[in-house]
Amino acid sequence: MTVIMLSPSNGWAISLDKVAQAIQPGKTKYLVINEPYNPAGTLMSQQTQQELIALAKKHSIIIMSDEVYRLLEHDSNDRLPAMADVYCQGISCVTMSKPWGGCGITIGWLAFPDVSLKQKLIDVQYFGTACPSRASELQAMMVLRASDHILDKNLTIVRHNKTLLKQFMHTYADLFSWTEPTAGAVAFIKFKGPMTSEQLGEQLAMQNISIKPAYCFSDEVTDETDCFRVGFGEEKMPKALAALGAFVEHHKENWRLAMRERRRRKSKL
């Protein structure tokens, strides 16, 4: 398996050149993507999606597209077509947990136009579970009957909380940076201060503030090591953001002093 790491340096964009280089003709069978991208909440363009499909089609590669944050685009005009709708060997993976907020239902589904894949996927399912919970199926049906109402409500929360998060990022632009998310309810924020995201997470945990440091997503040391994920899809997020802001206010001058000292040392090298 070849993993292609995305980078904040280009806004977490998929490099088609790297994908092409990773393909081993005749050996590569699947391309697995995460779109919208978790943890950064970014989206590829429709042109990139079409070029990716053309590349996969050239080598007869199945694209498995994790679309669990689809339908939570902050602007509906940015929404990409489901992979299953635009590629003959595309598979779209969806769950109840993200756009509908049905985390406890533990129900999801795969959509694909190639019926020859059906039995293969059913066989794979049996490695994890013999059958889904009937109670979860009934709950999922109830939620989906009210889908439009639930999505509208959740998007209202997401958009409001994102506005607050943007204000936070503007206020502390010298301490934090990001690629502004355009879909989903998560953002991947870079901490510019004098510690790793893991160390920051440990300090925040002592104040009952939870973030997801970079090591939760990769054990490799990359240019995202200082990044951490935050969620902004819940009604209680403004309270959590206020607590984070109070923590930053308490420490910001010491951080800035350490950052100036670090820059001074680098300038002497």
Predicted feature residues:
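Active-site phosphate-binding strand-loop segment of PLP-dependent enzymes
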Residues: 6-78
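Helix C-cap/helix->beta junction micro-motif
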Residues: 58-59, 172, 207, 251
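Conserved core segment of the aminotransferase class I/II
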Residues: 85-159, 166, 255-257
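Conserved glycine-rich beta-strand-loop-beta hairpin in the small C-terminal domain of fold type I
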Residues: 141, 157-166, 177-190
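Conserved C-terminal alpha-helix-loop-beta "cap" of PLP-dependent enzymes
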Residues: 176-177, 189-229, 234
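PLP-dependent enzyme catalytic core of the Aspartate aminotransferase-like
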Residues: 206-207, 219-269
